[in-house]
From Swiss-Prot:
InterPro entries: Phosphoglycerate_kinase, Phosphoglycerate_kinase_N, Phosphoglycerate_kinase_sf. This is Phosphoglycerate kinase. GO terms for biological process: gluconeogenesis; glycolytic process. Keywords: ATP-binding, Cytoplasm, Glycolysis, Kinase, Nucleotide-binding, Transferase. It is an enzyme of class 2 (transferase). It holds the Pfam family PGK. Transmembrane segments: none annotated. Monomer. Pathway: Carbohydrate degradation; glycolysis; pyruvate from D-glyceraldehyde 3-phosphate: step 2/5. CDD domains: Phosphoglycerate_kinase (cd00318).
Length: 396
């Protein structure tokens, strides 16, 4: 069933509550990456243009004690948002109370107000994170309709997403709509053939995703640290490479039942120490020295993976191929990025997290159909789990 989106709502003159994802990195009170603010702009601008009175909610970081508040205020976000919109954004340094209620009452059509960090409510019995029913009801009482545009927290049942949705007509913002379309599309109705590329350090992080994707993907290419548990399951010697002993049986069973679908590295870049300056050797996957660790897939693996990608109509990628933060071990990730970017007739999706950071930092941002804004949310969505934040959005 299709979900309501913001353009389905009548917004003129209404107080529109919106859950955005402004969980941006800060250093000394300055925003170091404003990507999440930029991604939120289309929905915000649409609500303003339609004459809505916009009240924005977001969390920022984890608030565990009173002293955390100072470094986790949303004031820098209000300033950045004001600059990007070219208009004043009223910032209310509270999450409830008369000051907030009065500021909302004084809003005119097209005005924007940002409420303080929703997780300040976690200091009193984790009211935000545990979806306290009274808090959700109170926040909902401040507005007429609700727009959820925070995919990054869609896998969480919090007062500021699910709690508010319980009491108000709820629609997805444009960013949330894109995530439902692309990540949801991979899971529910992909254009075949589908190739999934999985990387990153741990098999344990991706077990649910693998179990779901074997029913969807024609091929699953596995790189990154997680590949070595699979190679060990095949009986290969992996030296000091990353290994999850307790996942060998899972890998073995998967290779036995779905071996035709799974493609593993054929070579690797190995080193004696975990450092960018380490001496690098390229070896066949059968020749990893006992005193060395695989830090990246090798050129033959990039070639093999590129070949497997040819002809794919849908590609979903989650997790880098090696220690891409070290430039000497980024070639595998760059190679896969290039191979995906060169596909002509494919829908190409990065499922958030480290692979999204890698693609953006390596300059491939514009070469993908969609780069997800969610880390944990993307993974759970790819597992086929119905996310609470999406479930709470009204159907059309």
């Amino acid at each position: 069933m299709a979900k309501k989106i913001v353009s389905d709502l009548d917004l003129k003159g209404k107080v529109v509550l919106e859950r955005a994802d402004f969980n941006v990195p800060l250093k000394d009170g300055k925003i170091t990456n404003d990507n999440r603010i930029v991604q939120a702009l289309p929905t915000i601008k649409y609500i303003i243009e339609q004459g809505g009175k916009l009240v924005l909610f977001s969390h920022l970081g984890k608030v565990k004690q009173e002293s955390d508040k100072e470094g986790l205020t949303l004031k820098p976000v209000a300033d950045a948002l004001s600059e990007k919109l070219g208009k004043e954004v009223t910032f209310v340094p509270e999450t409830r109370g008369k000051k907030l209620e009065s500021a909302i009452k004084n809003l005119s059509e097209g005005d924007v107000l940002l409420v303080e960090n929703t997780r300040f409510e976690d200091l009193d019995g984790k009211k935000e994170s545990k979806n306290d029913p009274e808090l959700g009801k109170y926040w909902a009482s401040l507005g007429d309709v609700f727009v959820n545009d925070a995919f990054g927290t869609a896998h969480r049942e919090h007062a500021s997403n699910v709690g508010i949705s319980t009491h108000l007509e709820t629609a997805a913002g444009y960013l949330m709509e894109k995530e439902i379309k692309f990540i949801g599309g991979v899971v529910n109705d992909p254009h075949k053939p589908v190739v999934a590329i999985l990387g990153g350090a741990k098999v344990s992080d991706k077990i649910g995703v693998i179990k779901n994707l074997v029913n969807i993907a024609d091929k699953i290419l596995i790189g990154g640290g997680m590949a070595y548990t699979f190679l060990k399951a095949q009986g290969k010697e992996i030296g000091l490479s990353l290994l999850e002993e307790d996942k060998i049986d899972f890998a073995k069973e998967l290779l036995e039942s779905n071996g035709d679908q799974i493609v593993l590295p054929v070579d690797a870049k190995v080193a004696k120490e975990f450092s960018n300056d380490a001496e690098i050797t390229e070896v066949s996957i059968d020749n990893i020295p006992s005193d060395q660790e695989a830090m990246d897939v090798g050129p033959k693996t990039v070639e093999l993976f590129s070949k497997e990608l040819e002809g794919a109509h849908t590609v979903v990628w989650n997790g880098p191929m090696g220690v891409f933060e070290f430039s000497n071990f980024a070639q595998g990730t760059i190679g896969v990025c290039k191979a995906i970017a060169n596909l002509k007739d494919a829908t190409t999706i990065i499922g958030g997290g480290d692979s999204a950071a890698a693609a953006i930092s390596l300059g491939f941002e514009d070469d993908f159909t969609h780069i997800s804004t969610g880390g944990g949310a993307s993974l759970e969505y790819l597992e086929g789990i119905e996310l609470p934040g999406i479930k709470a959005i009204n159907d059309k």
